[in-house]
Amino acid sequence: NNFKVLYDGAQKMGYKDCHTGRMGINSMPRDGRNACLQLGFCFQGCKSGAKWSAGYTEIPKAEKTGNFELRTEAHVVQITHNKSGKVDGVVYVDKDGNQQKQKARIVAVAGNSIETPRLLLMSNTSMYPDGLSNSAGQVGKNYMRHLTASIYALMDKPVNMHRGTTMAGIITDESINDPSRGFVGGY
């Protein structure tokens, strides 16, 4: 697969820490999902079902419990809390544009690097004037992005780069934390 080409090249250049990356893709059948068939179109969904996705892994399981309701076309606009400051639900706008409140014992915020800070900041109250989880004033201040790169090369023989996962691999030898550069982690 495409990782073998990247790995061999990294080894020849002297890199030591080269791996396929940590992905939610089965290498063998597990939890009712097939093993990866190395089709190479992971960004477009997974035909074999090996790649983890809430849409076809967790949501169907939750529906089977009878304790789950999926509200499509809804948008959360605020996380709410009680008088002691403990999160107790969310306010959302439903598909018809009506504002609704949903009580909750636990709220999982999983909106990646844009929507998570937006929601935390929009959840400001008199108790949390700068938004939830923002006592240090850092929510929304430090944008983080997963960088990707594409490399093109002429090879002496066919390498079938269309085989394997979309991300061939990761070389982390140069990913050294050096705070003197003005930031933490990264390249």
For each of these PLM feature ranges, what is it?
Residues 1-76:
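Conserved redox-cofactor binding core of oxidoreductases
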Residues 49-50, 121-123, 138-142, 150, ...:
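Short C-terminal domain-edge/linker segments immediately following a structured domain
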Residues 23, 79-80, 130, 182-187:
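Broad, structure-driven detector of short, well-ordered beta-strand segments within folded domains
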